Amino acid sequence: MSKFIINPSNSMYGNLKIPGDKSISHRSIMLGSLANGVTKISGFLEGKDVLSTLKGFQNMGVKIERNSDNVIIYGVGLNGLKKSLVPLNFGNSGTSIRLISGILAAQTFDSELYGDESLSKRPMGRVINPLVQMGALIESNDGKLPIKIKGGQTLKGINYDLPVASAQVKSCILLAGLYAQGETCIKESILTRDHTERMLKGLGYRLDTNKNKICLTGGAQLNAANIQVPSDISSAAFFIVAASIAPQADITLIGVNVNPTRTGIIDILKLMGANLSLSNECVIGGELLANIRIQSAQLKGIRIPKDLVPLAIDEFPAIFIAASCAKGETILTNAKELRVKESDRIQVMADGLSILGIENEVFEDGIKIKGGVFSKPSSTIKSHHDHRISMSFAIASLRCHYAIEIEDVDNVQTSFPNFVELANQIGMNISLVSA
């Protein structure tokens, strides 16, 4: 196990290129494997979560070559996967296991899927239930991992109203729909990230989208293409918040994914008074990219709008740090989903903020944070093996006059392997220490 020791710093300057988007990297491996022909990927994220997806498809017979952040996939088509000789281990990656379940539900062979201790606590019923409605046969551990998927089932298209705002559930059903007889339609009451839909279209698959409804008909094919993965806004979020709260800061993040279904972090921080701007906007591979410049600002507390919650669901740990440095109170509700991430992010962040002297009140579906001044930490902060918790409390050092220690930070490797390197490059002072 490793820990962060972060010494105080109060300024950030420079330009950064953030690693590739995790969501898009996952999907590029999955859909590239199912496409006909050779898919070339650049900007691929080399984090542990995405490598779990890559390894899973290699175990199912797909030839994949990797050279740093460049990947070549020799697609096998929708029906070319082979039974893995070993159970498929997806480590800590909820995206991998939920999306791949939709693909495996339609295969001719049986599959067994499992993950690490953290992933084994997360709910799988939200994808199992619609897949069973489509005709899948799935055994689970009371709605959790491990799961066994029976091969040889004929799937049928369904009309499905998403009970929770989840791009993972939506994507799982769409991927199963590629194999299903007839039309599969999904209706979402609140907009969620749409990378799966964009990539399916980019690989030549027809989707019909009408406001909050997405439909596709099974039986068509995916055609290989070159995919450029933009920088991940969820990883960029730590530096966006860091520069916003630092006493002195002026940084620019290059080529960040600003897909409108992912920019809740930007919208929320602007409501709080952040000084940030976008430039050099362009569309590459169906995704919107831009440079983001962030300068120091005096933030104010807000009530976070309900419609922005799913558009910033992965960024809330960092937003909680921003709220801690804001003038007044910030209130978040309608975010119960945060309790079933890699950790209970509402409670774990609340506990850490209390260690730093920040008043907060926890709700079942959110939190109220009273902005203040970080005090001398009363103890070491526990990350609960959650990468976003570790990185969020690391950036708190920009407003803390004392060293902060964070336990169990190994999982930062799942999404942002060079976080410490980039943070120190622009003025932070983080040491990674083996415990």
Swiss-Prot record:
Intracellular or extracellular location(s): Cytoplasm
PROSITE patterns: EPSP_SYNTHASE_1, EPSP_SYNTHASE_2
Binding site for 3-phosphoshikimate: 22-23, 27, 166, 168, 314, 341
Superkingdom per UniProt: Bacteria
Residue positions of the active site: 314
Entry's EC annotation: 2.5.1.19
Annotated metabolic or biological route of this protein: Metabolic intermediate biosynthesis; chorismate biosynthesis; chorismate from D-erythrose 4-phosphate and phosphoenolpyruvate: step 6/7
GO terms for cellular component: cytoplasm
GO molecular function: 3-phosphoshikimate 1-carboxyvinyltransferase activity
Keywords: Amino-acid biosynthesis, Aromatic amino acid biosynthesis, Cytoplasm, Transferase
Reaction(s) catalysed by this chain's protein: 3-phosphoshikimate + phosphoenolpyruvate = 5-O-(1-carboxyvinyl)-3-phosphoshikimate + phosphate
Binding residues annotated for phosphoenolpyruvate, in chain numbering: 22, 94, 122, 168, 345, 388
Major enzyme class: transferase
GO annotation (BP), single: aromatic amino acid family biosynthetic process
Main subcellular location: cytoplasm
Family classification: Belongs to the EPSP synthase family.
PANTHER family for the chain: AROM/DEHYDROQUINATE SYNTHASE, PENTAFUNCTIONAL AROM POLYPEPTIDE
Subunit structure: Monomer.
Function, in words: Catalyzes the transfer of the enolpyruvyl moiety of phosphoenolpyruvate (PEP) to the 5-hydroxyl of shikimate-3-phosphate (S3P) to produce enolpyruvyl shikimate-3-phosphate and inorganic phosphate.
The protein's name: 3-phosphoshikimate 1-carboxyvinyltransferase
Species of provenance: Vesicomyosocius okutanii subsp. Calyptogena okutanii (strain HA)
Gene field: aroA
